[in-house]
A protein has these predicted regions:
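Generic secretory/membrane-interface signal
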Residues: 2, 26-27, 63, 102
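Catalytic PLP-binding core of fold-type I/II PLP enzymes
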Residues: 3-5, 10-44, 77
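Active-site region of PLP-dependent enzymes
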Residues: 37-43, 50-121
Length: 123
């Protein structure tokens, strides 16, 4: 399975109906880059929820930042969500069993607190 990655830019959404139709016809995942589209909508649905995965960056130069690098991925696909949960923590299914090579992709504590505070204020 391959992917297509539309990039929503400056709060303007891509033509997601067309993109999703093409992806469906060719058995592709749609991974949205919604970093510049916090709270932007396409046909009354939020950007980042229109494809298989939505990606948001917390980098200092993006619309929503947490004083350092970080990000979040959204999905309504349970299989992809389970895969992401696995790879976000070294591929571990428990303390002693690693089933896939992966990284530690969690925010540090300070960034998580800042992100939570900012989300309560702005979103």
């Amino acid at each position: 399975m391959y992917k297509r990655q539309p990039v929503h830019w400056a709060g303007r959404a891509c033509e997601m109906e067309k993109i999703n139709k093409i992806a469906s016809e060719h058995n592709l995942y749609v991974i949205e880059d919604a970093c510049h589209a916090i709270q932007a909508e396409y046909k009354f649905k939020r950007c980042g929820s229109l494809g298989d995965l939505g990606c948001f960056s917390f980098h200092p130069l993006k619309n929503l930042n947490v004083w350092g690098d970080g990000g979040i991925i959204t999905t309504s696909n349970e299989d992809l969500a389970n895969k992401l949960k696995l790879i976000r923590n070294h591929g571990l299914i428990n303390r002693n069993t690693c089933v896939e090579f992966a990284y530690n992709s969690r925010l540090d504590t300070i960034q998580a607190v800042i992100a939570r505070y900012l989300s309560l204020i702005h979103i």
